[in-house]
Curated annotation (Swiss-Prot):
It comes from Rattus norvegicus (Rat). It comes from the Eukaryota. The modification N6-acetyllysine is found at K111, K138, K163. Component of the ubiquinol-cytochrome c oxidoreductase (cytochrome b-c1 complex, complex III, CIII), a multisubunit enzyme composed of 11 subunits. The complex is composed of 3 respiratory subunits cytochrome b, cytochrome c1 and Rieske protein UQCRFS1, 2 core protein subunits UQCRC1/QCR1 and UQCRC2/QCR2, and 6 low-molecular weight protein subunits UQCRH/QCR6, UQCRB/QCR7, UQCRQ/QCR8, UQCR10/QCR9, UQCR11/QCR10 and subunit 9, the cleavage product of Rieske protein UQCRFS1. The modification N6-succinyllysine is found at K163. It is found in: Mitochondrion inner membrane. The modification Phosphothreonine is found at T214. Keywords: Acetylation, Electron transport, Membrane, Mitochondrion, Mitochondrion inner membrane, Phosphoprotein, Respiratory chain, Transit peptide, Transport. The gene is Uqcrc1. Component of the ubiquinol-cytochrome c oxidoreductase, a multisubunit transmembrane complex that is part of the mitochondrial electron transport chain which drives oxidative phosphorylation. It is a peripheral membrane protein. This is Cytochrome b-c1 complex subunit 1, mitochondrial.
Amino acid sequence: MAASAVCRAACSGTQALLRTCRSPALLRLPALRGTATFVQALQSVPETQVSVLDNGLRVASEQSSHPTCTVGVWIDVGSRYETEKNNGAGYFLEHLAFKGTKNRPGNALEKEVESIGAHLNAYSTREHTAYLIKALSKDLPKVVELLADIVQNISLEDSQIEKERDVILREMQENDASMQNVVFDYLHATAFQGTPLAQAVEGPSENVRRLSRTDLTDYLSRHYKAPRMVLAAAGGVKHQQLLDLAQDHFSSVSQVYEEDAVPSITPCRFTGSEIRHRDDALPLAHVAIAVEGPGWANPDNVALQVANAIIGHYDCTYGGGVHLSSPLASVAVANKLCQSFQTFNISYSETGLLGAHFVCDAMSIDDMIFFLQGQWMRLCTSATESEVTRGKNILRNALISHLDGTTPVCEDIGRSLLTYGRRIPLAEWESRIEEVDAQMVREVCSKYFYDQCPAVAGYGPIEQLSDYNRIRSGMFWLRF
């Protein structure tokens, strides 16, 4: 009787639990409607509005309730558009932009930016150049005016050019102290040898010492054209106001090329190769290994980003030890293989670099490469649904958290319009991520990793870095 009573009680308790789980009140709890809320949140993101001026300059904005705004000009020009003779000209101009314009000479530009409590920044990459200002939303008219002045009226006084040479040369010395920056420049130099993508953004020191006012003027007149520019804004910005301001200040930007000499991108070939810079005086070795990756618009990028998320990243300061979700991180901890590692997928217009960078002591290099290549081969042959689901969730989190604040959103708008021709909505990114499954990861990884020639760059105490032919043989498995 007692046992029967227990069974009846258990059955009635189960039925009560089932009734509770079907309760509309419980289903409204945040924890049980997280998926729906996530999708709805993506669909409720403000729309990116895009307009085009008569001269071809694109104006794009995303309005939000932020009291601040970030406004920037993105230009489709970088070191890959430069020649061996003028390599570094774009980086030089970026520095001169902070030193005044024809209308605001000397430190007048800096004082005017500071007077409204704004922050001016600029950067150059191999394909893009950007100038951006973050300020209060009420100062939008002044911000657009300042950006227009910087882009159209950079001061190229001989005295300022000479002064800036020394500044850039000192910066280059500081950059050389960053082993990670050096090894990635080495990786580009060997992977894209003989092509414009091999050129560093800063250019060689010989060019910095040699570039003249004429070189910089020619660079400006050749590349700073309206159809290659995007004026982007994010934050407390109304699109119509931004468009009106752009019409006032940017409509005079030229869209005509002298003698119809429209710059074009030269396709850059990838070469499986290596570059080694051995320096036993350094405490740790930096090694980067990469295969050729897809260009910006290639749909394979999403599956490859999921694959990179599965391999993950690691730093010796992390907690978790051998219980980290990344198999490579667990092996690295258990065997004390490295100080850190990270995967990367660097995309350009038609090509890219897909691989990993790690920092370790001299005696662990060979083992680290062995286990890294083992993870790549495993993804090519036996990626599972559970780890793909984990990778997709990691990618979702990175996608959302990256766009936190007006500056990251503004950068995403400007970069997206130059690379994709449009701003891809978060909801569309989510649908692309959702389509990825284990079969897709295996197929895409096999396409890019399996039996492919890698590019390898090593810097530091790298005596134990394996011979290239041995590294190449690790890019496939003999399966029977």
